């Protein structure tokens, strides 16, 4: 696929930029620039290796994983594929729409009721548990709706097909996950070196 080549080039550029940053930080610290923390020092190497996993563990990583699983489920269910709708698919689409509306109503009740569970302690929507869980909520809505459609329309014949759709979604997202890893590491390295 064409976007794989673009992502591979971006990853290569980020890798080169990371190596250049290692040597640039060392060079700038050697010229007695006080505001620069070198990555090629004992402190810098300890920071880089010791914080590597901690720096990558961000909500955005979980969001990418959840969205890729939801995307795979939606794609494999065939809910958006233009095709001649049989009676079974029309019925499945109607039931899935009803399920989606019910789920949206449940989420709305968890947000709009007085002293709602998903509001912050001050009663605000942003920031709140709802705003922090927005991507997981949207992913769950997409997964449940497309799973319902897929099982009713027989594009999913078993729960293994649903599981397989998650795998397919994750497989399609792997290049973006690799790009994410390199972007976060370069960004965090720049913050360490210069700030």
Where are these regions (language model features)?
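Transmembrane helix-loop junctions in multi-pass membrane proteins
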Residues: 24-32, 79, 109-121, 148-158, ...
């Amino acid at each position: 696929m064409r976007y794989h080549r673009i992502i591979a080039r971006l990853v290569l550029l980020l890798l080169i930029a990371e190596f250049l940053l290692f040597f640039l930080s060392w060079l700038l610290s050697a010229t007695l620039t006080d505001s620069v923390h070198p990555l090629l020092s004992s402190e810098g190497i300890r920071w880089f290796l010791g914080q590597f996993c901690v720096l990558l563990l961000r909500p955005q990583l979980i969001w990418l994983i959840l969205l890729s699983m939801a995307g795979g489920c939606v794609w494999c269910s065939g809910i958006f594929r233009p095709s001649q709708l049989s009676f079974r698919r029309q019925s499945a689409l109607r039931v899935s729409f009803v399920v989606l509306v019910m789920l949206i109503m449940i989420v709305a009740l968890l947000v709009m009721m007085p002293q709602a569970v998903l509001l912050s302690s001050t009663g605000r929507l942003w920031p709140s548990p709802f705003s922090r869980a927005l991507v997981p909520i949207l992913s769950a809505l997409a997964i449940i709706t497309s799973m319902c459609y897929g099982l009713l329309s027989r594009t999913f014949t078993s729960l293994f097909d649903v599981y397989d759709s998650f795998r397919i979604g994750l497989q399609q997202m792997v290049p973006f996950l690799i790009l994410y890893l390199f972007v976060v590491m370069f960004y965090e390295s720049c913050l360490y070196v210069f700030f």
